[in-house]
Swiss-Prot record:
Record note on quaternary structure: Component of the CCR4-NOT complex, at least composed of CRR4 and CAF1 proteins. Forms homooligomers.
SUPFAM superfamilies: DNase I-like
Principal EC category: hydrolase
Keyword line: Acetylation, Biological rhythms, Cytoplasm, Exonuclease, Hydrolase, Magnesium, Metal-binding, Nuclease, Nucleus, Repeat, RNA-binding, Transcription, Transcription regulation
Binding site for Mg(2+): E143
Record protein name field: Carbon catabolite repressor protein 4 homolog 4
Swiss-Prot/TrEMBL cofactor(s): Mg(2+)
Presence of the UniProt keyword Aminoacyl-tRNA synthetase in the record: no
MF-aspect GO terms: metal ion binding; poly(A)-specific ribonuclease activity; RNA binding; RNA exonuclease activity
Function noted in UniProt: Acts as a catalytic component of the CCR4-NOT core complex, which in the nucleus seems to be a general transcription factor, and in the cytoplasm the major mRNA deadenylase involved in mRNA turnover. Transcriptional regulator of circadian rhythms with poly(A)-degrading activity that affects the expression and rhythmicity of the clock core oscillator genes TOC1 and CCA1. Deadenylation may be a mechanism involved in the regulation of the circadian clock. May play a negative role in response against oxidative stress.
Catalytic activity: Exonucleolytic cleavage of poly(A) to 5'-AMP
UniProt EC number: 3.1.13.4
Family as reported in the entry's similarity comment: Belongs to the CCR4/nocturin family.
């Protein structure tokens, strides 16, 4: 709707024109005009990890800058007639974005958002516009609920192939998708991650004990079958959350293999232990997958993990992912994490002030993690708005952002093994 402050700036409509023509002309303005920011260079910034098992060792900043300068010179020489020239690296871009499933878009839940910005037609076109403008080689998307009916074909028209996993609950319609450019990478293999498997592991570990404790009704049925008691771990852990991981062979010049994982952990802050259990299961699966790829292809794959972790910097999940210790403030022996990780934003420019922006909650929930190695480094990151930026004032979604989350992204350079 037009406010009283903007109406007097509009040209006076021609009252002789048919009403339908006027309506058509006024509707040409989209409800959402996406605001997409640029990537900024972080070359020369060293990243590290408490675990150096992948062969990563920090080098002095001045040496990093010399390496970056050499790479820039090398890249500029591609295509020259010098046959002795050796290509030093190849770059690709990864973006993670919780696009807000349309099934969760209700005016009652988002009263701060302009109604026109919540309509599927406006949002879907705006999301596609954002993705197109970001020009990533990989997209890790969460809350994808129209994969077959909308995203698969539309992303295909933009030059992307996709893999997808839907949430496991019967009434859950959204899931996680990884879209990638076949011109950049070849899909080698993939695996699903279903966090409800945690329930099965508990059942397997305690089946004999459970058989003794479970009371049955007069009909002989399991009285816990329909239980909603969150004190019951079989109920507490069944949150229908999922993830997906895949190995990609980066095309020319030296076909390095990169593992890309995308996930969406449970949201409820009251179930922090559930989110931590999911994070631990995630890293254990990633470690197994990485070993599988290493053995099968006799290589050292790089690993990138992205998604909506529903965890703020410094909480148990975040601390576990970057240090292996869920409670860093306590003087306890660290638990060895299966995969060493560093947050790309944290080790370059610091975590964003927020990636989720609503009246009830504004903070950082989305991350891109990297397992540090000699073979891959971040060279740029996607800029994010400040809290007082005009395009986020009034919270999200709005006329500039089709989701309540912001996209995050990074560009990486792979060097020859």
């Amino acid at each position: 709707m037009f406010s009283s402050t903007t109406l007097h700036h509009l040209p006076r409509p021609n009252l002789l024109l048919p009403r339908k023509v006027i309506s058509r002309r006024m509707s040409t303005n989209p409800a959402i005009e996406p605001k997409v920011r640029k990537f900024e260079s972080v070359e020369g910034v060293d990243i590290g990890s408490r675990n150096k098992s992948d062969g990563f060792f920090a080098i002095p900043l001045y040496l990093s800058k010399l390496v970056a300068l050499y790479n820039c010179i090398s890249l500029s020489r591609i295509g020259t007639s010098n046959e002795n020239f050796v290509f030093s690296g190849i770059r690709f871009r990864l973006v993670s974005y919780n696009i807000l499933a349309q099934v969760y878009v209700k005016s009652a839940l988002l009263p701060h958002s302009p109604p026109a910005c919540l309509k599927w037609k406006a949002r879907s076109h705006a999301i596609l516009s954002v993705l197109k403008n970001l020009q990533a080689d990989f997209f890790c998307l969460q809350e994808v609920d129209e994969y077959d009916s909308f995203y698969r074909n539309n992303m295909d028209s933009l030059g992307y192939s996709g893999i997808y996993i839907q949430r496991t609950g019967q009434r859950k319609r959204d899931g996680c998708a990884i879209f990638y450019k076949p011109s950049c990478a070849e899909l080698v293999t993939k695996e699903r991650i279903e966090y409800n498997d945690l329930v099965d592991s508990i059942k397997a570990d305690s089946v004999s004990c459970s058989e003794q404790k479970i009371e049955t009704s007069n009909e002989g049925k399991d009285s816990r079958k329909d239980s909603r008691d969150l004190n019951d771990p079989l109920v507490r852990l069944k949150r229908d959350c999922v993830g997906i991981m895949a190995a990609f062979r980066i095309n020319k010049p030296f076909q390095h293999i990169v593992i890309v994982a995308n996930t969406h952990l449970y949201w409820d802050p009251e179930l922090a232990d559930v989110k931590l259990a999911q994070a631990k299961y995630l890293l254990s699966r990633l470690a197994q997958f990485k070993t599988l790829i290493s053995d099968e292809f006799e290589c050292t794959p790089s690993l990138l993990l992205a998604g909506d972790f529903n965890s703020i910097p410094g909480d148990m999940v975040y601390s576990y992912l970057v240090s292996g210790n869920a409670k860093p403030t306590e003087t306890i022996e660290e638990e060895e994490a299966p995969v060493p990780l560093s947050s790309v934003y944290e080790v370059t420019r610091g975590e964003p002030k927020f990636t989720n922006c609503t009246p009830g909650f504004t903070n950082t929930l989305d991350y891109i993690f990297i397992s540090p190695s000699d073979f891959i480094k971040p060279v740029s990151i996607l800029q994010l708005p400040e809290p007082d930026s005009p395009d986020v004032v009034g919270f999200l979604p709005n006329h500039h952002h089709p989701s309540d989350h912001l996209p995050i992204g990074a560009e990486f350079e792979i060097r020859r093994e």
